[in-house]
Amino acid sequence: MTKRILLVLCGLLAIALWAPQARAADRFEVTSIKAVRPTLVKTVDALQKNNPKGAREAFGEYDSAWNGIEVYINTRSKVMYDALEHDMQATLTAKLAESTPNLPDLLPLAKSMLATFDQAIIMVEKGQPLNPLYDDVARLRIVRAHLREVNPALRTGDIVKARKSFGEFDEKWDSIEDLVKDRDVKAYATIEDGMTNIGLALKQATPDVAKVQTLVSGVMDEYNKIVAQVTKEARGQ
């Protein structure tokens, strides 16, 4: 009987120790940051294969995904944020933009960036949950990331990419539209109207690029107001 009680107590202790880790792993903050990691892995892989096009595409995916979740890292550690954003990412972006990038030289930097990103994941997993409003900020930014891709794609003449990115934004808009509507009904209506017009414009066989860019910028302006408002709320301002 005593042995059975000890086994039960040990089991309860193990559950108690494991539960906080499980809760941390399930947090939206943790899962969202981990979801970005594969884009860095793809970047490293492309560099190892001496594939500049693949590296640019993968790192472009990272940049877009990072924009969604960087608020978490910036809030928890300005030092780590600056290392990832202003040091390593800025350097890799500039070097990959060169006509003939020296990929072997960039590989160690990309690996270092991946290692730093892994440290960020550990930091977040071990940290206490932030104000839940930061999750709302991240949700807004994650969805917005797709809209941010549209105008750059149009500038390079990549209509297919512009349509794809807007389609992803349109699809994910439903997940956060109530967040926007609750803050500002007028902004919500403006965004909805703008999205309808963008969708129609992009359906044309040869879209009017200048018109679409103007429409996208208009939607972005209203959307950014909501992001700024929720960010202030999260910071208690």
Language-model regions: role of each:
Residues A24-Q237:
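Mature extracytoplasmic or organellar-lumen-exposed domains after removal of signal/transit peptides
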Residues M1-L9:
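Bacterial N-terminal signal peptides that target proteins for export
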